Amino acid sequence: MTQDIHDKAERSGSPHPLRWRILGFLGVAQLMLILDVTVVAIALPNIEADLDLSRQAVTWTVSAYTLTFGGLMLLGGRAADLFGAKRIVLTGLLVFTAASLVTGFAGSDGLLLGGRVAQGLGAALMSPAALSLVVHLFEGDERNKALGVWSALGGGGAALGVLLGGLLTAGPGWPWVFYVNVPIGLVILAALARMLPHQKAAAPRPRLDLLGALLVTASSAALIYAFIRAGDDGWLTIATAALVLLAAVGYVAFVARQKTAKSPMMDVALLARRPVATGTFLILMATALMIAVFFLGTFYFQHAEDFNALQTGLLFLPVAIATMLGANLTGRAIATAGARRLAVIGLTTAAVGMAVPAVSMHPATVVAGTAIAGAGTGAMFVVASATALGQVAPHESGIASGIVSTFHEFGASIGAAVISSVAAVSLVGDTLSGFTNGFVLAAVAAAVSAAAAAVLTPGRER
């Protein structure tokens, strides 16, 4: 029935009549993927105690998901273009849901980390394919509004994850931060299987560039791991330098491979386009700043103020609301105000918010400042997505979405690694100077990015 509705709409040239309902289900699915970073971070102390995890295993509980999610994102985007976004969305959602069940049952670090890797694989398949569907189903001003809804859910998801993680950890226990994905995932899977239109493959015998996927995944993994190690050991180490060099060599090899492969993962010239390049820069900065907010706020509340996980989660509720509000308002205003102006406003707002706790460190100022910063970063998610994806061809929407989502994960890794290094003195001692320095760095980074956005972001078309 739903396919008949889609076919009639396609023949008449009208938009898909179920597009907003589809967006709702896709948005909730994306929300699960974003939640799975911060919801786990709050539960880590309990997981560590129950499974007797080493410090390295605790770190990998978060980074294994981020590494796999970010490293395989381009593969997911290319698969959506070749095999159809519907097929890849459903496959990724099924893998993520099953992996969540396995991870919740984990009784050892091996099963826990294996489940996290599998969750990352499912997320890497689903996220770019879902964003590709959003771009495909909506046009013009409606697309900007849809991206606003999408970004509000994704941007607010990280803050909501802190609240949900605190509630679940304090209630039924840490396994439920994973179990909660299972019933939600199954409902969304059944709904999308019925509502999403069938799509034809891009070619009679579609192929994936597996060597290219291996190169970009390994390079991305090496780079993200370098950031993680730098947060613990410092930048001036042989291991960190070797990982950065390995990543650079891998990316060069990837570019060379894309120019010779019969079925390349992406047209490398796509990143040379000003809108795409600017959009990826903006999404990287927005995510890095967002992670800085949650990292600094979470550890400040729990280490310096001795709040528990549930109290910390409740304190982040204003941040979640502000993030979603900033994204939603920006989605409504971008068609008239333009991406450049809103990019500058969003980053300036984030800089002001970060500066508040840097000047005066107190629970009230941290909540107020991070909420202001959250509104700014929420706006940035919309501007970045609209800038990078607004002018790509339909057959490129999957890989372009993959690029945007990849830099989203890169931003999370960079933000966590750099901020944790700057704030390290406050994580192991009683001083607040590390937290102050972290907020100062975030404020300066946002201000510099605002100046860069004023120059780099394309102006409104006339």
Region locations from a protein language model:
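12-transmembrane solute porter fold
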Residues: 20-35, 40-42, 55, 61-65, ...
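Conserved aromatic/hydrophobic "specificity hotspots" at molecular recognition or selectivity sites
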Residues: 174-214, 262, 272
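Interfacial helix-loop-helix linkers and transmembrane-helix boundary segments
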Residues: 80-87, 143-145, 202-208, 264-267, ...
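Short, hydrophobic alpha-helical segments
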Residues: 194-195, 231, 452-456
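Membrane-interface helix caps and helix-loop-helix hairpins in membrane proteins
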Residues: 109, 173, 200-205, 230-236
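Transmembrane-helix bundle of Major Facilitator Superfamily
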Residues: 2-194, 328-330, 336-379, 383, ...
